[in-house]
Amino acid sequence: MHGGLKSTLVMLTHKIGTGIKVVKDFDRSLPEIPAHPAELNQVWTNLIDNAVQAMNGVGTLTIKTYREDDHVVVSIGDTGPGVPENLKKRVFEPFFTTKPVGEGTGLGLDISYRIVVNGHGGDIVLESQPGDTRFQVRLPVAEPSST
């Protein structure tokens, strides 16, 4: 998983630019998880790209991994303006975007939600206030049961 996060950061280096500080706080003791790496790389790309855009070239992007009970958590945070309370419930809706026309399709977070929840049996949660927005992706350590 850490390899996918690192490769996503490399891929987005030009977009991240020099005004955004990247903080990586990776728990190296995390177990391997049953996952589709290419799909998760799409999630990391969507979340990191959104965070970078929210900060408008200046701020701190924090990527943290840790274990919480029977899940591995990837937290991607930014120091942008935050998501207004009245929009938090809508961010995972298909075609919902706060970006200007032509700059976003409103599908990135919907796709990310489907990959994490439907494809991996995990969860993705938004916590946001001005200066501290975090998407927390929770992925099960074990295969989801098919019962």
Regions found by a protein language model. Give the residues of each.
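Core catalytic ATP-binding domain of two-component histidine kinases
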Residues: M1-T147
